[in-house]
Amino acid sequence: MSDTFQRIAPEQVRQLRENGAQVVDIRDPQSFAVGHISGSRHIDNHSVADFIAAADLDAPLVVVCYHGNSSQSAAAYFIQQGFSDVYSLDGGFELWRSVYPADTSSGEAE
């Protein structure tokens, strides 16, 4: 089990997603509704405990925020909670949207 997360580029996130990684978006609900990485899950302080309880701690987890800053703190938190393979998207959703505009969705979290 690793005790640190890795910062990765959008291209690496795309590859991890193709191999079944879970992507979580920690931005505010309004920003998530306007646009997010297709297939990502919105989590916040109210839903994080349920997410952790149901998650596969050994599966790769990618954390996304606005620009890649807040996701680093959240990634470190997930490591502390027992996740073994955690990544932070460098550049955040803003960079993802500029690199992969067709691989974004809109709508509220389920």
UniProtKB/Swiss-Prot annotation:
SUPFAM superfamilies according to UniProt: Rhodanese/Cell cycle control phosphatase (SSF52821)
Gene3D superfamilies in the cross-refs: Rhodanese-like domain
Catalytic activity: thiosulfate + hydrogen cyanide = thiocyanate + sulfite + 2 H(+); thiosulfate + [thioredoxin]-dithiol = [thioredoxin]-disulfide + hydrogen sulfide + sulfite + 2 H(+)
Any matching Pfam family: Rhodanese
The Rhodanese domain, residue ranges: 17-105
Molecular function per GO: thiosulfate-cyanide sulfurtransferase activity
Alphabetical list of CDD domains matching this protein: GlpE_ST
The EC number(s) this enzyme carries: 2.8.1.1
Keyword presence, Transferase: yes
One cellular-component annotation, GO: cytoplasm
GO terms, biological process: glycerol metabolic process
Family: Belongs to the GlpE family.
The protein, known as: Thiosulfate sulfurtransferase GlpE
Originating organism: Pseudomonas aeruginosa (strain ATCC 15692 / DSM 22644 / CIP 104116 / JCM 14847 / LMG 12228 / 1C / PRS 101 / PAO1)
